C-alpha cells in the first residue's frame, strides 16, 4: 500500500500557527493520574522518537540498541493503540533497531513512512534531495577525514555530523565545514541537535509535518483521539507544537527545560514506566 502526500488537507498550514510559548514542562509522573484520566475517555495514539527517548544517548549511533524490556513494552502497547516511531534515522535503520512489525515507522524526519501493512510514504518533493545529500556526505567525509572522533552519517534524506567524540578545540572547524557545504547548496539547510549538526532539505517538512500527516492518514485527527508524542531533542519541538490543543507532548530531559511540550520525563527509564502505564489504561484493543 502506497500512501501519497497529496492526501494532506490543504489547510494543514493552520496547524502550525498557534504555537505554544516555550515554558518549563511539568513532571509527567507527578501528573500521571490526570494524564491517565484523559486516556480513559479518548482513543490513544502514541508517537515516539528513538534516540534519547527509547534508548539512552550514546557515543556512537550504532550503539543505541533497544533494550528487550522496552521492546516488549512497545509490543504490548501496540496491541492496545496505534504506536509510531518518528525518528531522524533512516527508515530501514530505525525499523531494524526496533524490530517490531506491529508499529508504524517514520524515518528521516518523516520523509519515509512505513505502515504495518507494508505501505511506504516518500514525500513527493523528497526524491530530488537524495543525490544532494549524498554529495554533501562525500564532501564532508573528505573535508573532515583528519578530525578525530567525527562521525558523518548519511541517512538518505538527511545527513548527520556527530561531534560527541570530537575535542572541543575541533568543534568550530566541524561546524564551519558543515556551514560551507550548506552555503554552497541553497536547497540544503543546517539544523542542530544533541552533539550533532544535521544537513536536511531546505523545505517545510519536519517531524511536526510528519505527525500531522500521520494523524490525518490514520484517521486519528479527531476530537475523541488523544495523540501523545515523546521526544528529547530540538527536532521534536516541531511535533510538540503540532499537539498544542490537540494532544500531549512529553520532553525527555533530566532537568526542567524550556519546551513546547506540556510534560517532562527524566530519562528512558521514566519513558518506560510511562508507556507501561499507558498500556494498562489504553482505550480498547486493536483488531
Indicate residue ranges for each PLM-predicted region.
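Conserved acidic, metal-coordinating active-site core of Asp-based
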Residues: 139, 147-229, 234-243, 247, ...
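Hydrophobic "anchor" residues on beta-strands that sit immediately upstream
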Residues: 45-47, 104, 228
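Active-site phosphate-binding/coordination module
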Residues: 65-155
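A general structural motif
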Residues: 41-43, 80, 102, 156, ...
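Conserved Rossmann-like nucleotide-cofactor binding loop
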Residues: 53, 91, 235
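Non-catalytic pre-domain segments flanking phosphatase-related domains
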Residues: 1-50, 54, 58, 69, ...
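Mg2+-dependent phosphoryl-transfer enzymes with acidic/Ser/Thr/Gly-rich catalytic loops
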Residues: 16, 21-29, 41, 120, ...
Amino acid at each position: 500500500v502506497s500512501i501519497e502526500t497529496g492526501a494532506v488537507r490543504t489547510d494543514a498550514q493552520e496547524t502550525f500557527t498557534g504555537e505554544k510559548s516555550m515554558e518549563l514542562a511539568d513532571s509527567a509522573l507527578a501528573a500521571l493520574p490526570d494524564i491517565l484520566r484523559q486516556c480513559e475517555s479518548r482513543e490513544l495514539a502514541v508517537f515516539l522518537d528513538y534516540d534519547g527517548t527509547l534508548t539512552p544517548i550514546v557515543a556512537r549511533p550504532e550503539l543505541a540498541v533497544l533494550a528487550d524490556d522496552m521492546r516488549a513494552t512497545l509490543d504490548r502497547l501496540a496491541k492496545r493503540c496505534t504506536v509510531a516511531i518518528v525518528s531522524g534515522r533512516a527508515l530501514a535503520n530505525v525499523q531494524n533497531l526496533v524490530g517490531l512489525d506491529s508499529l508504524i515507522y517514520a524515518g528521516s524526519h518523516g520523509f519515509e513512512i512505513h505502515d504495518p501493512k507494508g505501505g511506504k510514504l516518500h514525500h513527493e518533493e523528497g526524491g530530488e534531495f537524495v543525490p544532494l545529500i549524498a554529495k554533501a556526505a562525500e564532501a564532508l567525509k573528505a573535508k573532515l577525514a583528519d578530525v578525530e572522533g567525527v562521525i558523518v552519517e548519511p541517512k538518505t534524506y538527511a545527513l548527520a555530523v556527530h561531534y560527541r567524540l570530537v575535542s572541543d578545540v575541533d568543534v568550530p572547524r566541524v561546524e564551519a565545514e558543515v556551514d560551507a557545504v550548506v552555503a554552497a547548496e541553497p536547497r540544503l539547510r543546517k539544523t542542530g541537535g544533541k552533539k550533532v549538526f544535521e544537513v536536511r532539505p531546505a523545505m517545510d517538512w519536519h517531524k511536526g509535518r510528519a505527525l500531522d500527516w500521520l494523524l490525518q492518514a490514520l484517521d486519528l485527527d479527531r476530537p475523541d483521539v488523544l495523540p501523545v508524542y515523546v521526544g528529547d531533542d530540538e527536532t521534536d519541538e516541531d511535533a510538540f507544537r503540532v499537539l498544542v490543543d490537540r494532544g500531549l507532548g512529553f520532553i525527555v530531559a533530566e532537568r526542567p527545560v524550556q519546551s513546547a511540550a506540556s510534560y517532562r520525563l527524566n530519562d528512558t527509564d521514566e519513558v518506560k514506566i510511562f508507556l507501561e502505564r499507558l498500556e494498562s489504561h489504553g482505550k480498547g484493543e486493536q483488531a
